[in-house]
């Protein structure tokens, strides 16, 4: 059994716990969040406005969260270096705080006795891995990043298209559901003025490093891809719109066939494929990183095409976090 601790019990941390509990090879032994007491952790885990109630039994015992009889120690420590990871025999820490996402800060978990760290955010300094794209390049690094939910949606599709037809250049737009950092009403947001506007009543243009990050996990696309985001008032599920200038001429049917083939092969759990007339809520709880929407894409000419792919930016991403944990273990 691989012993796992979760640092940061927000949207991703809680879903990662739900998923990890279903994996036979993993044992979650601890959760740390300085802002959440043990009884509140139980409540937040049990009830979820987006993904519904947890189906099993959730209680507490002293400082432990007890899920279906399985005890998980809960800590409220601000500095990861002070956590008892060594004493608990923690193999891998999943850091979903969004705070400790660089090598120097994530190192604190190793100093506390953990063997490895998986960061659930893009990182400037830690190597980034996207399951289905470059996880085979993993070479024993102790601190790794699972990149972002949008990179996990975009990279597999970009890889399939690039492998088959070549990408000369591409622009991505993600139409992205709201996240915890946005505001319920207009409020201060000094780094991103637009991001401080009411989330539920606006379409908000935003920056994203997701497209450029594809160049880190697929070096052959370095400098060929960039993108931006629109934050829209939906609670979960987002969609990538990728406009591509192809190196080789292709019909849209050939592109569809290439993605469909990949979705039935070794990328089966990562890439989904649909020709149905779907909308965003149809993908709530979908475990794929990306679902290619064959009937939404369009083609202008043999080398100029727009493809569309959906993703549950919470649940699908959390599934890949746990996949990466199993892989680095």
Curated annotation (Swiss-Prot):
Q: Please list the residues that bind NAD(+).
A: 11-12, 33, 78, 313
Signal peptide positions (record)? none
**Catalytic function, reaction form:** D-glyceraldehyde 3-phosphate + phosphate + NAD(+) = (2R)-3-phospho-glyceroyl phosphate + NADH + H(+)
Family to which the UniProt record says this protein belongs:
Belongs to the glyceraldehyde-3-phosphate dehydrogenase family.
GO MF annotation list = glyceraldehyde-3-phosphate dehydrogenase (NAD+) (phosphorylating) activity; NAD binding; NADP binding
InterPro entries linked to this entry: GlycerAld/Erythrose_P_DH, GlycerAld_3-P_DH_AS, GlycerAld_3-P_DH_cat, GlycerAld_3-P_DH_NAD(P)-bd, Glyceraldehyde-3-P_DH_1, NAD(P)-bd_dom_sf
Which SMART domains does its entry note?
Gp_dh_N (SM00846)
User: Where located?
Assistant: Cytoplasm
Q: Which Enzyme Commission numbers does its entry carry?
A: 1.2.1.12
Which Pfam family is one of those matched by this entry? Answer: Gp_dh_C
Q: Which residues bind D-glyceraldehyde 3-phosphate?
A: 148-150, 179, 208-209, 231
Task: State any GO CC term.
Answer: external encapsulating structure
User: This chain belongs to which protein, by name?
Assistant: Glyceraldehyde-3-phosphate dehydrogenase 1
Q: Where are the active-site residues found?
A: 149 (nucleophile)
Q: Does the keyword Oxidoreductase apply?
A: yes
**Which major enzyme category is it?**
oxidoreductase
Per its UniProt record, what PANTHER family does this chain match?
A: GLYCERALDEHYDE 3-PHOSPHATE DEHYDROGENASE, GLYCERALDEHYDE-3-PHOSPHATE DEHYDROGENASE-RELATED
- GO BP: glucose metabolic process; glycolytic process
Q: Which UniProt keywords apply?
A: Cytoplasm, Glycolysis, NAD, Oxidoreductase
Superkingdom of the source species: Eukaryota
**Site (Activates thiol group during catalysis) residue list:** 176
* SUPFAM superfamilies documented for this protein: Glyceraldehyde-3-phosphate dehydrogenase-like, C-terminal domain, NAD(P)-binding Rossmann-fold domains
Q: How does it assemble?
A: Homotetramer.
Q: In which pathway does it act?
A: Carbohydrate degradation; glycolysis; pyruvate from D-glyceraldehyde 3-phosphate: step 1/5
Protein's UniProt keywords contain rRNA-binding: no
- Source species: Kluyveromyces lactis (strain ATCC 8585 / CBS 2359 / DSM 70799 / NBRC 1267 / NRRL Y-1140 / WM37) (Yeast)
């Amino acid at each position: 059994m691989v012993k796992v601790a979760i640092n940061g019990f927000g949207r991703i941390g809680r879903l990662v716990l739900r998923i990890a509990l279903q994996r036979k090879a993993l044992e979650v032994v601890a959760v740390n969040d300085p802002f959440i007491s043990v009884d509140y952790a139980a409540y937040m885990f049990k009830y979820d406005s987006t993904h519904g109630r947890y189906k099993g039994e959730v209680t507490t015992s002293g400082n432990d969260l007890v899920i279906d009889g399985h005890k998980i120690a809960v800590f409220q420590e601000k500095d990861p270096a002070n956590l008892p990871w060594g004493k608990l025999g923690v193999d891998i820490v999943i850091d979903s705080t969004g705070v400790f996402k660089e090598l120097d800060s994530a190192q604190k978990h190793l100093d506390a006795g953990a063997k490895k760290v998986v960061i659930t955010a893009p990182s400037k300094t830690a190597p980034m891995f996207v399951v289905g794209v470059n996880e085979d390049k993993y070479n024993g690094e102790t601190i790794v990043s699972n990149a972002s939910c949008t990179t996990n949606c975009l990279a597999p599709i970009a890889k399939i298209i690039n492998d088959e037809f070549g990408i000369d250049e591409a622009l991505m737009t993600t139409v992205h559901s709201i996240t915890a950092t946005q505001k319920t009403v207009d409020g201060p947001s000094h780094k991103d003025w637009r991001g401080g506007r009411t989330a539920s009543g606006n379409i908000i243009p935003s920056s994203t490093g997701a497209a450029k990050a594809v160049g880190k996990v697929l070096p052959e696309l370095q400098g060929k891809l960039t993108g931006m985001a629109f934050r829209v008032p939906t609670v979960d599920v987002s969609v990538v719109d990728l406009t591509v200038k192809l190196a080789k001429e292709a019909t849209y049917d050939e592109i569809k066939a290439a993605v469909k083939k990949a979705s039935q092969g070794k990328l089966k759990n990562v890439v989904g494929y649909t020709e149905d007339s779907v909308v965003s809520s149809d993908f709530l709880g979908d475990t794929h990183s990306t679902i290619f929407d064959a009937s939404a894409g369009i083609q202008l000419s043999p080398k100029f095409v727009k493809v569309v792919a959906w993703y549950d930016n919470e649940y699908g991403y959390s599934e890949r976090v746990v996949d990466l944990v199993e892989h680095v273990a």
